[in-house]
Amino acid sequence: IDSPEMALSRLMDEGYTKVAVQSLHMIPGAEFHEINVNARLFAQMAGGIDQVIVSWPLLVSDETMEKALQGIMTRVVPKQRQADEAIVLMGHGTHHPSDAIYSALMYKAQKMDANLFVGTVEGSPSFEEIKEVLVRKKIRKAYLIPFMTVAGDHAMNDMAGNEPDSWKSQLASVGIESGPVMKGLAEFDAFVGMWIANLKTAMAHLK
């Protein structure tokens, strides 16, 4: 699979003059901004692409956060989940200021369902914080869901792996059963639809 830069280079070689790039990131973090900068460089090259627009990732507003959480609750959470069982979303997290979006998402999640939580691998809220709340609430089971485009390395190892520091193992150590959901958000039409809507908006701005 081409990197965004390789794909843009190939499109330039093939004579395309207007290109819309759709980010499949969750938030506008460091990687998103890197793609944004690199994409614009192609529009500045002599004989390059005339216009390049990079569209927004999944979460950029109150509306998109609420829509994403509704998608989680209606499309991703297993139907057998009981109200006293927790749902813990695993976000990637980042040192970029946009990491604050995960805390905002957590706030909205708690307003939607008192047992819906958002943790991150590399940012805030941390899993340690979430685990402490689960213990305090005497939660007996938690569904672990990757809040990521694909259920890749973080989901397989950091979330559902058998190593002592995985989220599943850490919950087991305090007597909480886990129910990992091994699917990324790109496997659900509700989220694909959000990205496609962003792409359509970007394409409408190509002149």
Predicted segments with their positions:
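Active-site-proximal alpha-helix that buttresses catalytic centers in soluble enzyme cores
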Residues: 1-207
